[in-house]
UniProtKB/Swiss-Prot annotation:
Name of the protein: Large ribosomal subunit protein eL8B
Any GO BP: maturation of LSU-rRNA
Oligomer status and interactors: Component of the large ribosomal subunit. Mature ribosomes consist of a small (40S) and a large (60S) subunit. The 40S subunit contains about 32 different proteins and 1 molecule of RNA (18S). The 60S subunit contains 45 different proteins and 3 molecules of RNA (25S, 5.8S and 5S).
Organism of derivation: Candida albicans (strain SC5314 / ATCC MYA-2876) (Yeast)
Gene Ontology molecular function: RNA binding
Free-text function comment from the UniProt entry: Component of the ribosome, a large ribonucleoprotein complex responsible for the synthesis of proteins in the cell. The small ribosomal subunit (SSU) binds messenger RNAs (mRNAs) and translates the encoded message by selecting cognate aminoacyl-transfer RNA (tRNA) molecules. The large subunit (LSU) contains the ribosomal catalytic site termed the peptidyl transferase center (PTC), which catalyzes the formation of peptide bonds, thereby polymerizing the amino acids delivered by tRNAs into a polypeptide chain.
Cytoplasm recorded as keyword: yes
């Protein structure tokens, strides 16, 4: 057995620091707080979960939680896989060049056309056919079916989702590039509306052809090429922390029971 270490000698001329003993006033009694029911005032906490929110907020929250908890079929789950931020910014930058005319611009164009017709010219001489973004669900579906659409953007938050749930399959069948983007409101601002479920490009100017082809190749890599793979993946099934803790506790108890029986 090894000998115990010797005590180190104190430093010479070392003065012991005198402990300052503060005299406590006997009049002031310590009153520890008790946060039980009906006792001390509770400390400030985040009580937002107890707030009675408006019905539309409650529905939003319930819908969000249910979409996480329940098993979601692949056809609906694919709408959670939206286009990444940088590619979406490029797509909207391109589509912004081809926004439809506003009511003021339309009035100005019609005035010019009327003046041209009065002079004996045709309307096409004054205003050639504009190249604009197409919108409206029925219109875009007919463009896809006729293979006229070059790029289709679908909103991920359309309600009811059944309106657009078939579009990815239709685009894949017709070989039309498509992407799922965040926000029907963002597509709506593109076409001067509050919301829009879909937007499509049928043609672009020759200056933007290279940019469009580059964008399509990026989008196809994320959607059309991964279509078969996405068809196999179900969504949801993500449980909350309390449920996960219960499952872990049961698994631990089962493992302990097996080890004791062995």
């Amino acid at each position: 057995m090894a000998p115990k270490g010797k005590k180190v000698a104190p430093a010479p001329l070392a003065t012991k620091s005198a402990k300052s003993s503060e005299s406590k006033n006997p009049l002031f009694e310590s009153t520890p707080k008790n946060f039980g029911i009906g006792q001390s005032i509770q400390p400030k906490r985040n009580l937002s979960r107890f707030v009675k929110w408006p019905e539309y907020v409650r529905l939003q929250r319930q819908k969000k939680i249910l979409s996480l908890r329940l098993k979601v079929p692949p056809s609906i789950a694919q709408f959670s896989q939206t286009l990444d931020k940088n590619t979406a910014a490029q797509a909207f930058k391109l589509l912004n060049k081809y926004r439809p005319e506003t009511s003021a611009e339309k009035k100005e164009r019609l005035t010019k056309e009327a003046a041209a017709i009065a002079e004996g010219k045709t309307a096409k001489d004054v205003s050639p056919k504009p190249v604009v973004v197409k919108y409206g669900l029925n219109h875009v579906v007919s463009l896809i079916e006729n293979k006229k659409a070059k790029l289709v953007l679908i909103a991920n938050d359309v309600d009811p989702i059944e309106l657009v749930v078939f579009l990815p399959a239709l685009c894949k069948k017709m070989g039309v590039p498509y992407a799922i983007v965040k926000g029907k409101a963002r597509l709506g601002t593109l076409v001067h509306k509050k919301t829009s479920a879909v937007a499509a490009l049928t043609e672009v100017n020759s200056a933007d052809e290279a940019e469009l082809s580059k964008l399509i190749s990026t989008i196809n890599a994320n959607y059309i090429e991964k279509y078969e793979e996405n068809r196999k993946h179900w969504g949801g099934g993500i449980m909350g922390s309390k449920a996960n803790d219960k499952i872990a506790k049961k698994a631990k108890a089962a493992a302990a029971a097996v080890s004791t029986s062995n």
